[in-house]
């Protein structure tokens, strides 16, 4: 029996059918059993004849297949949960950013129009009915406070990570 590792999760075990096939010349010509490992030839002869080696081979292959399936399922669940966590955090940061900038969904349009008509702002628009909407009515006077900058940075970062996790799922 000769072991050759093609990848960390794939182990190829080659069982010899007879003693002649265990010669080093024959091992070099077989594609699955190139002589790359440092096993003793006598130990390989004794292992290839015993039924315990076949049981060991089947248990190793079964455990590697189970490990591969469990690890792929675990990685898929971690990626899905990270994507949903980043999506949820992006919405939370956007809400906090809007609330810290002064936007309140409970304000009615008449209250905001009345308050904005008394304010003088450099960015204002007037309509035909006489109502005035300024930048303070919309809620974004600019990101002036450090909290606004921090929340905006967190929102952009979570958006980038959510897009990166979507790329990882594909």
Curated annotation (Swiss-Prot):
Name assigned to this protein: Putative uncharacterized protein YPR136C
Source organism phylogeny: Eukaryota, Fungi, Dikarya, Ascomycota, Saccharomycotina
């Amino acid at each position: 029996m000769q072991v050759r590792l093609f990848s960390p999760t794939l182990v190829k075990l080659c069982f010899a059918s007879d003693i002649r096939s265990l010669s080093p010349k024959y091992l070099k010509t077989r594609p699955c059993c190139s002589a790359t490992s440092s096993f003793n030839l006598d130990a390989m002869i004794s292992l290839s004849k015993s039924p315990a080696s076949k049981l060991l081979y089947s248990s190793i292959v079964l455990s590697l297949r189970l490990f591969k399936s469990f690890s792929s399922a675990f990685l898929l669940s971690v990626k899905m949960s990270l994507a949903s966590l980043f999506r949820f955090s992006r919405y939370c940061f956007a809400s906090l950013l809007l609330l810290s900038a002064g936007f309140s969904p409970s304000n009615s349009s008449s209250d905001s129009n009345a308050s904005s008509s008394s304010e003088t702002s450099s960015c204002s628009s007037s309509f035909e009915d006489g109502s005035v909407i300024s930048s303070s009515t919309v809620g974004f006077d600019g990101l002036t406070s450090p909290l606004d900058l921090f929340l905006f940075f967190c929102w952009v970062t979570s958006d980038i990570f959510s897009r990166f996790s979507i790329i990882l799922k594909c």
